[in-house]
Design a protein with these regions (language model features):
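N-terminal Rossmann-like NAD(P) cofactor-binding subdomain of oxidoreductases
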Residues: 1-194, 229-231, 293-294, 298-304, ...
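Charged docking surfaces used in two-component/phosphorelay signaling
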Residues: 70, 161-337
């Protein structure tokens, strides 16, 4: 019998946590015992996993020494509290929040881009999962960077409300229903009405005029590519779509590269689906439930001699969070456990 691993999911009742549960089953991850953890409020809720019923436990009462691997998606404050405790018990923590991403001695990993960085988990038994928008962009840009190098990235994102969790999904649904029935729309989760609207602010505003979400893309790109010379100029926009993020990516390369060569490279890249000609991916039609990154509208930039433009789409809850975390765990048990 192949080795099995006891897995804990912190934040099991959230959008990402529930999706991690699905992905573990779909990818047949070798789970021995499964521990679903959440706050006292969710204690006792049950889920089905591999034909069995699993009960949600109160994280405050959990013995971390029972787990080998833990997947965290319960928010930065809970990661800050519980990840070091779990790690001290020998658990390898894969954290979906931003809390540990920018610490120099912890790996920030996209398995298709920098799987070798996983080895750094030995520093503190913690691996950070990048921001959803960074993940899909870098999966698409990795082969270009390897081929000719990247100097600068201009990117505009069009991010669905599921990036704000279940509360974001509920707010879009509720506002849409009210407005279509002639009622005023209440806003709680977003700074402005999200139904039938676009909001060019995700996360808090920083002193430099960028949002924290935008600066995440800057910091994470440089760390994952291990190249602080790459400049990144993002604008992140929340759009009234339930699932899936899209990005208009404009890249300036160190050496010119033809669009057809980019297409050829991407067609050979693990985890990428290329759309050709006038066919292009969209969040609503293509992204939902997919674990890979979709790229279309690939063309040379008519305004720059070394420019390439791409349209990049992915399911932010899966590849942008849950699937990427499970893929990290797969590499971990294959190469390091």
């Amino acid at each position: 019998m192949s080795q099995q691993y006891n897995v804990a999911i912190l934040g099991a009742t959230g959008a990402v946590g529930e999706t991690i549960l699905e992905v573990l089953q779909e990818r047949k991850f070798p789970v021995g015992e499964l521990f679903l953890l959440a706050s006292e409020r969710s204690e006792g809720k049950t889920y089905r996993f591999n034909g069995k019923t699993v009960r949600v436990q109160n994280v405050e009462e959990f013995d971390w020494s029972q787990a080998h691997i833990a997947l965290f998606s319960a928010g930065g404050d809970l990661s800050a509290k519980w990840a070091p405790i779990a790690a001290d018990e020998g658990v390898i923590v894969i954290d979906n929040t931003s809390h540990f991403r920018y610490e120099y001695d912890l790996p920030l990993v996209v398995p298709e881009v920098n799987p070798e960085a996983i080895a750094e988990f030995r520093n503190r038994n913690i691996i950070a999962n990048p921001n959803c928008s960074t993940i899909q962009m870098l999966v698409a840009l990795k082969p270009i960077h390897d081929a000719v190098g990247i100097e600068r990235i201009n990117v505009s994102t069009y991010q669905s409300v599921s990036g704000a969790g279940k509360a974001g999904i509920d707010e879009l649904a509720g506002q849409t229903a009210k407005l279509l029935n002639g009622l005023p729309a209440d806003k709680k989760q977003f700074s402005q009405q999200i139904a039938f609207n676009c909001i060019p602010q995700i996360d808090q505003m920083m002193e430099n005029g960028y949002t924290k979400e935008e600066m995440k893309m800057v910091w994470e790109t440089q760390k994952i590519f291990n190249d602080p010379s790459i400049t990144v100029n993002p604008t992140c926009v929340r759009v009234p779509v339930f699932y899936g993020h899209a990005e208009a990516v404009h890249v300036e390369t160190r050496s010119p590269i033809d669009a057809q060569e980019v297409i050829n490279l991407l067609e050979q890249t693990e985890g990428v689906e290329v759309f050709h000609g006038d066919d292009f991916p969209t969040q609503v039609r293509d992204a939902g439930g997919k674990d890979h990154v979709m790229v279309g509208r690939i063309r040379n930039d008519i305004s720059h001699h070394s420019g390439v433009n791409l349209w990049v789409v992915a399911d932010n809850v899966r590849k942008g969070a849950a699937t990427n975390a499970v893929q990290i765990a797969e590499v971990l048990i294959r190469d390091y456990y």
